């Protein structure tokens, strides 16, 4: 009984070992088939692509190295028109060599003493092209030396507004005859500015501001006399004649006019002489003429 049981166990173990070995063999065959059928072809194609990339990069490196040695003057003399295609192809091939030996030989032949001379000739041609007067693209416009000097308006003449600037023809016609008139206008402008400064200072001292032009009822006599005197000076000639006629025609003003003459004749005090002038009423606005 013991021997029979031992033989059965040995047969079972032998069968199990055989089954496992068959599984291992099948797995190895599958791996070999996968490597030979799928992996090896892909590796071969990848190696071919890498070789092509290496060749292309080597050619590009040679091309970029030789671009600095290209002689444009020699290649510009290629035939144009009905020239054969082979000659054009040969000239273009000379620009981009296919091997390093040809590149070195071309660099030796191109680097000669005539290269600097050709560059100088090219620069001269370009310079003559840009300096050619017959080219319309680089023709500059005519520049005139005549002009008109504009006179800036006076900043103090704000009431009269901006005056029209005389044209060049008018200034040419007037000529040198306006020299004295210009001097008189400058003097009158200076006088006007000085009067305005005095009045603004008086107003600022009285009210603390130079923008107020309305007198107060409590203005002292000195201030009223000064304002009336400045208003009398700034009136125009025509306005002075009309005002004098109106004053002389008025019976009230005529009554005041006679005491003034008597005061001048009798040499009375300054207070009585100034009392004959017309004093502006409180609330009136005084306008100063700035006409030249």
Curated annotation (Swiss-Prot):
<keyword id="KW-0159">Chromosome partition</keyword>
<keyword id="KW-0597">Phosphoprotein</keyword>
<dbReference type="InterPro" id="IPR013964">
    <property type="entry name" value="DASH_Ask1"/>
</dbReference>
<dbReference type="GO" id="GO:0044732">
    <property type="term" value="C:mitotic spindle pole body"/>
</dbReference>
<keyword id="KW-0498">Mitosis</keyword>
<protein>
    <recommendedName>
        <fullName>DASH complex subunit ASK1</fullName>
    </recommendedName>
</protein>
<dbReference type="GO" id="GO:1990758">
    <property type="term" value="P:mitotic sister chromatid biorientation"/>
</dbReference>
<keyword id="KW-0132">Cell division</keyword>
<dbReference type="GO" id="GO:1990976">
    <property type="term" value="P:protein transport along microtubule to mitotic spindle pole body"/>
</dbReference>
<feature type="modified residue" description="Phosphoserine">
    <location>
        <position position="26"/>
    </location>
</feature>
<dbReference type="GO" id="GO:0031116">
    <property type="term" value="P:positive regulation of microtubule polymerization"/>
</dbReference>
<dbReference type="GO" id="GO:0042729">
    <property type="term" value="C:DASH complex"/>
</dbReference>
<keyword id="KW-0539">Nucleus</keyword>
<feature type="modified residue" description="Phosphoserine">
    <location>
        <position position="134"/>
    </location>
</feature>
<feature type="modified residue" description="Phosphoserine">
    <location>
        <position position="156"/>
    </location>
</feature>
<feature type="modified residue" description="Phosphoserine">
    <location>
        <position position="155"/>
    </location>
</feature>
<dbReference type="GO" id="GO:0005737">
    <property type="term" value="C:cytoplasm"/>
</dbReference>
<comment type="similarity">
    <text>Belongs to the DASH complex ASK1 family.</text>
</comment>
<feature type="modified residue" description="Phosphoserine; by CDC28">
    <location>
        <position position="250"/>
    </location>
</feature>
<feature type="compositionally biased region" description="Acidic residues">
    <location>
        <begin position="265"/>
        <end position="275"/>
    </location>
</feature>
<feature type="modified residue" description="Phosphoserine">
    <location>
        <position position="118"/>
    </location>
</feature>
<comment type="function">
    <text>Component of the DASH complex that connects microtubules with kinetochores and couples microtubule depolymerisation to chromosome movement; it is involved in retrieving kinetochores to the spindle poles before their re-orientation on the spindle in early mitosis and allows microtubule depolymerization to pull chromosomes apart and resist detachment during anaphase.</text>
</comment>
<keyword id="KW-0131">Cell cycle</keyword>
<feature type="region of interest" description="Disordered">
    <location>
        <begin position="149"/>
        <end position="194"/>
    </location>
</feature>
<comment type="subunit">
    <text>Component of the DASH complex consisting of ASK1, DAD1, DAD2, DAD3, DAD4, DAM1, DUO1, HSK3, SPC19 and SPC34, with a stoichiometry of one copy of each subunit per complex. Multiple DASH complexes oligomerize to form a ring that encircles spindle microtubules and organizes the rod-like NDC80 complexes of the outer kinetochore. DASH complex oligomerization strengthens microtubule attachments. On cytoplasmic microtubules, DASH complexes appear to form patches instead of rings.</text>
</comment>
<feature type="modified residue" description="Phosphoserine; by IPL1">
    <location>
        <position position="200"/>
    </location>
</feature>
<keyword id="KW-0995">Kinetochore</keyword>
<dbReference type="GO" id="GO:0051987">
    <property type="term" value="P:positive regulation of attachment of spindle microtubules to kinetochore"/>
</dbReference>
<dbReference type="GO" id="GO:0051301">
    <property type="term" value="P:cell division"/>
</dbReference>
<keyword id="KW-0963">Cytoplasm</keyword>
<keyword id="KW-0206">Cytoskeleton</keyword>
<dbReference type="GO" id="GO:0005874">
    <property type="term" value="C:microtubule"/>
</dbReference>
<feature type="modified residue" description="Phosphoserine">
    <location>
        <position position="216"/>
    </location>
</feature>
<keyword id="KW-0158">Chromosome</keyword>
<dbReference type="Pfam" id="PF08655">
    <property type="entry name" value="DASH_Ask1"/>
</dbReference>
<feature type="region of interest" description="Disordered">
    <location>
        <begin position="99"/>
        <end position="118"/>
    </location>
</feature>
<keyword id="KW-0137">Centromere</keyword>
<keyword id="KW-0493">Microtubule</keyword>
<dbReference type="GO" id="GO:0072686">
    <property type="term" value="C:mitotic spindle"/>
</dbReference>
<feature type="region of interest" description="Disordered">
    <location>
        <begin position="227"/>
        <end position="292"/>
    </location>
</feature>
<feature type="modified residue" description="Phosphothreonine">
    <location>
        <position position="140"/>
    </location>
</feature>
């Amino acid at each position: 009984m013991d021997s029979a049981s031992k033989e059965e166990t040995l047969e079972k173990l032998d069968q199990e070992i055989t089954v496992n070995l068959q599984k291992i063999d099948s797995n190895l065959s599958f791996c070999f088939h996968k490597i030979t059928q799928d992996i090896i072809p892909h590796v071969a194609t990848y190696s071919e692509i890498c070789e092509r990339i290496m060749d292309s990069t080597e050619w590009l490196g040679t091309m970029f190295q030789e671009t600095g040695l290209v002689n444009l003057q020699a290649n510009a003399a290629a035939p144009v028109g009905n020239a054969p295609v082979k000659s054009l192809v040969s000239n273009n091939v000379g620009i981009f060599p296919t091997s390093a030996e040809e590149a070195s030989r071309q660099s030796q032949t191109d680097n000669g003493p005539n290269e600097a001379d050709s560059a100088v000739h090219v620069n001269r041609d370009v310079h003559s092209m840009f300096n050619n007067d017959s080219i319309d693209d680089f023709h500059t416009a005519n520049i005139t030396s005549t002009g008109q000097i504009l006179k800036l308006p006076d900043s103090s003449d704000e009431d009269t507004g901006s005056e029209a600037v005389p044209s060049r023809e008018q200034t040419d016609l007037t000529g040198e005859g306006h020299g004295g008139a210009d001097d008189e206008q400058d003097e009158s402008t200076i006088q006007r500015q000085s009067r305005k400064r005095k009045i603004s200072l008086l107003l600022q001292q009285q009210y603390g501001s130079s923008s107020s032009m309305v007198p107060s009822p409590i203005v002292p006599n000195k201030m009223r006399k000064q304002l009336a005197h400045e208003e009398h000076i700034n009136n125009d000639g025509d306005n002075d004649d009309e005002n004098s006629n109106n004053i002389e025609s008025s019976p009230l003003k005529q009554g005041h006019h006679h005491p003034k003459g008597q005061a001048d004749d009798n040499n009375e005090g300054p207070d009585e002489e100034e009392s004959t002038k017309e004093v502006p009423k409180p609330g009136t606005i005084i306008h100063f003429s700035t006409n030249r």
